[in-house]
């Protein structure tokens, strides 16, 4: 895989699926990579929503749970993924960042013997859920359910992230939760940010993080 003319090109030399979003604006020079979850029920549904002008939001890339890639905007164009955001004294990260959305339901609520997405109302099995606190939670906040990411999805995100870091000499990898704390919680505690960031920044500690899962605590 490579990046050519700010588009992702697959190993067979063909561009990855490209569906252009209207929710973008002018040219920019990216400095950061921002990770998100879609909070939707499918990658296809999230792509369709981000291509709807009514959404007024879109990332540059959506990664499905099967590792599939759909690009919505060239990597040198402003995509409206960050919203009101601040990092290191600078605001409006749409203007200097690339956004990746991973198909993931995010927060889940327990309803009887099922886990339900508050957004899509879709149910998820225990095997796809982890219990955790968000890093921005107040002390004493009880843990809640979070939708797990798939291994192939995380590997696809890593490979794309490595390409983006090299191509654009990006300074850092951040979560939406870092640049809009209190307003956003993605990509959330199910995303292994420490190891992901270490791999992309070329640091020694790239081991996967471990979390309490439902199977371990017998919920």
What are these regions (language model features)?
Residues 117-120, 185-199:
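Aromatic- and acidic-residue-enriched segments that line the glycan-binding/catalytic groove
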Residues 168-183:
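Acidic/histidine-rich, metal-coordinating catalytic segments
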Residues 217-219:
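Conserved small/polar residues in nucleotide/adenosyl-binding loops
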């Amino acid at each position: 895989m490579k990046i050519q003319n700010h588009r992702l090109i697959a190993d067979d030399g063909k561009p990855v699926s490209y569906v252009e979003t209207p929710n973008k604006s002018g040219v920019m020079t990216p400095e950061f990579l921002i990770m998100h979850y879609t909070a939707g029920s499918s990658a296809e549904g999230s792509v369709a929503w981000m291509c709807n002008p009514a959404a007024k939001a879109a990332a540059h890339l959506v990664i499905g749970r099967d590792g599939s890639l759909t690009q919505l905007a060239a990597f040198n164009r402003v995509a409206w993924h960050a919203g009101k955001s601040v990092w290191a004294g600078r605001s409006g990260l749409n203007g200097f960042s690339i956004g990746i959305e991973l198909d993931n339901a995010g927060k889940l609520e327990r309803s009887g013997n099922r886990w339900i997405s508050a957004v899509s109302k879709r149910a998820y099995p225990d095997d796809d859920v982890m219990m955790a606190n968000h890093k921005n939670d107040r002390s004493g906040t009880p843990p809640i359910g979070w939708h797990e990411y798939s291994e192939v999805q995380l590997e696809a995100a890593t490979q794309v992230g490595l390409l983006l870091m090299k191509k654009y000499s990006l300074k850092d990898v951040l979560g939406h939760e870092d640049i809009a704390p209190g307003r956003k919680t993605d990509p959330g505690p199910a995303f292994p940010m420490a190891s992901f960031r270490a791999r992309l920044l070329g640091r020694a500690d790239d081991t996967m993080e471990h979390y309490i899962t439902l199977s371990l605590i017998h919920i």
